[in-house]
C-alpha cells in the first residue's frame, strides 16, 4: 500500500508511519509502501 511518503532523504519516516497502521515499510523507487 502506498501512503504517499517519499523515501528520500530517509526510510525512517516511511517505516515509522507504516508500523502505526500496517506491519512494515519498504521502498520502491523513492516511494514508501506499507505491507
From Swiss-Prot:
GO terms for cellular component: extracellular region. Expressed by the venom gland. Keywords: Disulfide bond, Neurotoxin, Secreted, Toxin. One of its GO terms (molecular function) is toxin activity. It comes from Buthus sp. (strain IY-2001) (Scorpion). It comes from the Eukaryota. This is Neurotoxin. It is found in: Secreted. Disulfide bonds join 7-27, 14-32, 18-34. Neurotoxin. Decreases the action potential of myelinated nerves in mice and frogs.
